[in-house]
């Protein structure tokens, strides 16, 4: 406070000698010093200069942002006050200049200075002029001052001698913004951020005091404090480099305007508006509307364009991510061609690969380390005289194709010994004469179906004579054959063909390797004891049936519970044969209607006729029920089944029809010739079959001993049988047809039964023959 009073006394003493020209120069210098002092203090001298000279009306020292804002606004100000040129005289020598209060930051650009200063060399016109910088003036007062007009050079100011210039009140920041004119630096001001509340309110008293002290130091006068002047000079030097460009532009612009102005002052200083109350130095922030940034929502006022913040709820659009480029699959690599690392002297071509599982020791000194896979599977034949080099060995890590197998017809060397524990593949056929004598048969081979290339006995190589009988247990084979006889008789009760696989599974079992002999022994027992023949009706599916032999005289119509069904079957077979070996379903049902049999009506003896014809007879292979080709809607027809061809013949059926009609079979010439040809073919086939059976039985040693000895039915295992749903499990032997029992007792008495006569012999044999004749008389009346 003491420094401030001393500085004020020095200025009063300097006022007595100052003229108007001096005042003009001082005002210009003061404005430039204010611009310099607005920069933030860069050294301790600036801080010292601004510290003790603070105005008592300010609440806090100006910050760096406030000083920068004052500099920007001062540079953009278009001064409305003209200054006189050099040698101009002031009419009022006693004019007083009061700079007691500093201008506000926002009010400087629009403040028209109302005081003129003399040139540097002009004499002071008013000895009593005083310059008071003790109080800061508000910016609001400067903004409201009337405009002043000044004359050009060498013109006198028409100001009264006692004009007083008072800058005591300072303008408010809000008032300055509304009256601020646009200057040449508008573009620069638009890019400047709007100051915050702290930068809008400031006290420039410290800057003005520092500027006045700097001017006094440059032109020393009485009563100037040395310390304050030095501090101001230091502050001006520190910010000179920072504000050099702005000072040059502002000074040049002011000079041009001073030289071009020739105006007069329109009003005196006494006509100024009343000073307003000093505003607070922390006024509210002034929003400055700028252009919205790209991508922002409309109708939003942005206060700080550079320090831009997103409004609530607004998010930046996420950048679109480019999907990663699709990677092409790696190029398929061609497997390298397999090369044979062994240099063969002669071309070796194997037909099929052979994989050796165990080491094989060759007669030559060559030891195979492991599995050997031969390349090139094409018919390999060694030239005569070719031998393996004595010193050649297979590389230890060499392997060929894993799926290569040896040829089936490749002969092994005669002197090539095989390891005793080396197993042969199960599906590798061997020559019939190449089976070692001491070669054991694996236990699991007993349940497999034997190959025709294998001998019945594993010790077949023991004898050089292949036709000689081999030592075996005949009693065990005959015992298994007897079980098979009982099994076949029970299975034939349902008239369903018997499969060979069922016989192997249920009866033969572990004797699979000799099953042909067991089956042949069973056939011999059936023929000699029961007069029944085991007939294979299907060579592909291996289906067997039991039929009566010609010597038994028990044809298709035996005295059984199925006699009515078999009588109807004989009529149906006749209808089919007389219609060209096929009869449509409509034709057959028309013939049965004339006999009083209709589909859908249950018969007391025959049951359901439709099920009997289309299911039971078809399942028993008596009939074949199939669809007519290319029929729309579909139609079905009946044909003879496989069993019918073996249990009867076309000639027998034709004789039956002729006997019913009391006509000669030769009356139907076409049917008679066809039946005769079939009968001749059947006789030739039966003769060839009988010859083959006799040869096989001689080779197997089957004779009368096969039927000798006690016969027991208690050794059969009933749980192995596959019964029909109509079977009686309590009394299984009741299922055996009566014909079988009659044939058995006939053979026991060594005579033929005379009570079983079929339609083949004559119409007056038995009740069954009469039943068939009655059906035939009704069913074949339409036959011409």
Curated annotation (Swiss-Prot):
Polar residues: bias regions: 195-214, 232-246, 259-269, 306-320
Keyword entries, A-Z: Biological rhythms, Cell membrane, Cytoplasm, Membrane, Nucleus, Phosphoprotein, Repeat, Tumor antigen, Ubl conjugation pathway
Statement: the UniProt record of this protein carries the keyword RNA-binding: no
Domain of life: Eukaryota
Gene Ontology annotations for the cellular component aspect, listed alphabetically: chromatin; cytoplasm; nucleus; plasma membrane; protein-containing complex
Membrane topology: Peripheral membrane protein
Sequence repeat feature ranges: 302-307, 308-313, 314-319, 338-343, 344-349, 350-355, 356-361, 362-367, 368-373, 374-379, 380-385, 386-391, 392-397, 398-403, 404-409, 410-415, 416-421, 422-427, 428-433, 434-438, 439-444, 445-450
UniProt keyword annotation of Transmembrane present: no
Residue numbers bearing the Phosphotyrosine modification: 97
Localization terms from the record: Cytoplasm; Cell membrane; Nucleus
Residue segments, region Disordered: 41-67, 195-339, 379-418, 441-471
Entries under InterPro entries matching the protein: MAGE, MAGE_WH1, MAGE_WH2, MHD_dom
First-listed, main subcellular location of the protein, grouped into a coarse class: cytoplasm
Domain MAGE: 477-675
Compositionally biased region (Low complexity): 47-65, 383-403, 447-461
PROSITE patterns: MAGE
SMART domains for the chain: MAGE
Composition-biased stretches (Pro residues): 404-418
One term of GO molecular function: identical protein binding
One GO biological process term: circadian regulation of gene expression
Region ranges (22 X 6 AA tandem repeats of W-[PQ]-X-P-X-X): 302-450
Biological role: Involved in the apoptotic response after nerve growth factor (NGF) binding in neuronal cells. Inhibits cell cycle progression, and facilitates NGFR-mediated apoptosis. May act as a regulator of the function of DLX family members. May enhance ubiquitin ligase activity of RING-type zinc finger-containing E3 ubiquitin-protein ligases. Proposed to act through recruitment and/or stabilization of the Ubl-conjugating enzyme (E2) at the E3:substrate complex. Plays a role in the circadian rhythm regulation.
PANTHER family registered for this protein in UniProt: MELANOMA-ASSOCIATED ANTIGEN D1, MELANOMA-ASSOCIATED ANTIGEN MAGE ANTIGEN
Subunit structure: Interacts with DLX5, DLX7 and MSX2 and forms homomultimers. Interacts with UNC5A. Interacts with TRIM28 and PJA1. Interacts with NGFR/p75NTR and RORA.
This protein's name: Melanoma-associated antigen D1
Taxonomic source organism: Sus scrofa
Lineage: Eukaryota, Metazoa, Chordata, Craniata, Vertebrata
